[in-house]
């Protein structure tokens, strides 16, 4: 059989040649693989979540967690978030804390595996991209996101982006200042961070 006959048979049967899938972009890690958060601001973890307002429009939520203190350091609630938006938020958090993290742990999302993020991190922050399909390697922020989903997003319907920002911000404040963690000696993250001697 030649290729013309094969094409004719495919066409008669209404079949199509499968399109090649685009390969997922993978970030290039610049930090050592075995990174431990043995003090505040050593390792920050970043991850995204999605929700919708009642009109069906998407909400994108980014959270930045200090892996040692478990504090939610910052984040954004927007309709869309680019790598440049995330860089602005990371700069804001670093300015507020007076330092950048040694390592930023994240997945391979397009906002994180972009050229702008690599340029921003070069020389000042090590990037540690977890392997695709292994979210447990970013466990602290995944655990945080699970609580955010169960205790905030699943029990609230957001009428607007502004309402979502306020409700999520209030939840994050409560998480930082009132939620006790057994791994922190049953202290809330903010109190533990204020008394932490691991510098």
Model-derived regions, located:
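Charged DNA-binding/catalytic regions of mobile-element recombinases
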Residues: 1-199
């Amino acid at each position: 059989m030649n290729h013309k006959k094969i094409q004719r048979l495919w066409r008669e049967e209404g079949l199509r040649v499968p399109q090649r899938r685009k390969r997922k972009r993978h970030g290039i890690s610049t930090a050592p693989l075995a990174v431990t958060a043995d003090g505040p601001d050593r390792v920050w973890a970043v991850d995204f979540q999605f929700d919708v307002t009642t009109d069906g429009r998407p909400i994108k939520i980014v959270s930045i967690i200090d892996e040692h203190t478990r504090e939610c350091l910052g984040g954004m609630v927007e309709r869309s978030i680019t790598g440049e938006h995330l860089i602005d938020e990371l700069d804001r958090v670093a300015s507020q804390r007076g330092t950048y993290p040694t390592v930023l742990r994240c997945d391979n999302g397009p906002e994180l595996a972009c050229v702008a993020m690599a340029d921003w991190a070069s020389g000042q922050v090590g990037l540690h991209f977890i392997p695709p399909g292994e979210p447990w390697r970013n466990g602290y922020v995944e655990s945080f996101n699970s609580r955010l989903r169960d205790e905030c997003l699943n029990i609230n319907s957001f009428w607007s982006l502004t309402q979502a920002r306020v409700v999520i911000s209030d939840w994050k404040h409560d998480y930082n200042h009132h939620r006790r963690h057994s791994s922190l000696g049953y202290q809330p993250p903010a109190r533990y961070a204020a008394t932490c001697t691991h510098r």
